[in-house]
């Protein structure tokens, strides 16, 4: 698309955002008590914001104007954060992580695919050089250590007699095949000789021969034509995809080329813009700097004279902390400025007196308050739930609405009615840069002018009033205790503070950590196997389909199992979006830890690697088996955690992965695993979570296939969000035209889909099998030899089904055990409680209606 088209798309998206903000501000002022209506309102806002986010992300990725992109980025981060806030509101309202919008999508006339939250492409594009450089360093360290060498499979040693027998069997089989082929050829020759003897006395008629050839040819031609017509009819009726469905069209190839060209233009315009910022500021400093300085001095001198004429004395010059001479030019009279300065001084004195009185009063009241708070906390969960039902619901304050409103107002002021007919290539606008840099230059010059005018005011007071300025008294305070460490210990002051905090929490009395640069620490972690290379897996490779019966099942009081697409959405919302954007991570509801629980083979490990791939994050492996034998002892463990989180903070975003995390929280450690000390991290994980702040883009991700083996309370205390990853449902295994499991994986491994391969039968038969098992079966069937045979021997369903017989599916009992375990988690308990309260209220309403009916009779 052209620049004009993307500009038009941006204007339409801004209009939609403007109307949505108006609606949201209106709804926020109207408290509601009905939870169903509240959820529908939140879900509608959520879906509308997702549509705006999809369009805005596309515009930001393709638009080439550097100044427009800055504004779009601001709005984009605001929309992204607002989506996370609305998701958090829906979770607190429904007490579940999974929501279904079937009815709302139908009302808005949207398809389920339009509900998919995209991953912004700028997460990787703007950090591409950093990510590539880090990958090169990691690859170099791995090659030096010999950790990335291909796995050499050792040959199985067998006895000499067995080897001779194997060779003899193979040789005899080869000779047998040759003998059988030779005998077959002799038999065919004899058959041909017999036919020739029988037909030898008859002369062949040329007309009969021609008719015979025509008959065979016409039959073959008509059969081929019928097959072609049948395929065309199936495509027309929508019962079969078009033959061009899996082929990449020329239009798509051309659009990719245009996209790459736009990326180059975008980069060039950004470089020109950065150069223009420096050049234009220098030009303004040379041309307008002296005039601005002279104008400011004249204004301040005029203020001196006006204040002396009104009050009889020269005024006190405002301090730099209060804004300096900026206070003078805030459209106020000299009397108002003097009044403000005096008022602030009086307020400071009053606050000091109040604090002293409050400190004395609070000492006696502390004990009484603590007793009252303990009594108030002893309210049962059921009473709280009933109170929440009766109270009116109000939306919690948003930190992103103001950001979006600022971006929207800037768009209206600058870009809405701006004439850009002169700017066809969409380069930077120099006038906007001049306005911005003129303000910066004025602030810089004002600081210099303030120093000069303060001295001038002193001289005036000495000359006219004979006054000596009394220097302000320095406030006496407690001396801060400073601890000096060697520079090599903590290069970054922020990391030093964090390290000191860790030492205080864990009671470390001395420094035993490996001191050095981040590069050396990075290399040490790689060599120890704690920092690993993430696999190149995109989140879109986690194939799944939308759950079309979610709302219907919940209306009948049946809790549906989430679909794979629902899991993918949660990974995007809780893992990828906050890690990818620092602005969103600082303001959005903070998610420090994430747990993926589900049977073996459902793709938990793949999702962890997808988070790292989509955000360019480092991957640290602190699994119980991986850290076994490394950094032994208590001090060694503290040193390891310190190193991991120091590097993770410096090179954020980072993901700390704990595979088989139930081992860290075992109820009872198995005898075979006691030597690995799997519970080493159990004590330290809650403390680490407390140290993570909003500006630390670090996510702790745990994966488990046996969560019921762990102690529930400490397990749920560490993991803030728990996502249940299910086995694929029928919609995910089979679909008509969407990317679904069987079709997509067969095509990826070189297979061809034909009429002889019944995908529907495969999807039905493989109910209960996981994605990992399906992938393994397809790889086992589609060998190199089988791929070469596809031209004359198409794939059939029976080939895959026979391979499936050797595998065990996820049985209903195992799935129910995961559901029962999830119902014991904090969010699961709240969900069960809210459902029971809702059912009781429905029964009460039915009873009231029945009594009314009897009275009428």
UniProtKB/Swiss-Prot annotation:
Feature: compositional bias, Basic residues: 365-375, 847-857
Which subcellular locations apply to this protein? Cytoplasm, Cytoskeleton, Flagellum axoneme
State the residue spans of region: Disordered: 348-388, 834-857
The terms under GO molecular function for this entry are: ATP binding; ATP hydrolysis activity
Concerning Pfam families, the annotation shows: AAA (PF00004)
Record-linked SUPFAM superfamilies: P-loop containing nucleoside triphosphate hydrolases
Protein keywords: ATP-binding, Cell projection, Cilium, Cytoplasm, Cytoskeleton, Flagellum, Nucleotide-binding
- Composition bias of kind Basic and acidic residues appears in 376-387
Q: Which GO terms describe its cellular component?
A: cytoplasm; cytoskeleton; motile cilium
Q: Where is the signal peptide?
A: none
Known InterPro entries for this protein? AAA+_ATPase (IPR003593), ATPase_AAA_core (IPR003959), N-DRC_Component (IPR052267), P-loop_NTPase (IPR027417)
Residues annotated for ATP binding in this entry? 598-605
- Assembly mode: Component of the nexin-dynein regulatory complex (N-DRC).
Q: What does the UniProt record say this protein does?
A: Component of the nexin-dynein regulatory complex (N-DRC), a key regulator of ciliary/flagellar motility which maintains the alignment and integrity of the distal axoneme and regulates microtubule sliding in motile axonemes.
The record's comment on protein family reads: Belongs to the AAA ATPase family. DRC11 subfamily.
Matches recorded under PANTHER family: DYNEIN REGULATORY COMPLEX PROTEIN 11, IQ MOTIF CONTAINING WITH AAA DOMAIN 1
Q: What is this protein called?
A: Dynein regulatory complex protein 11
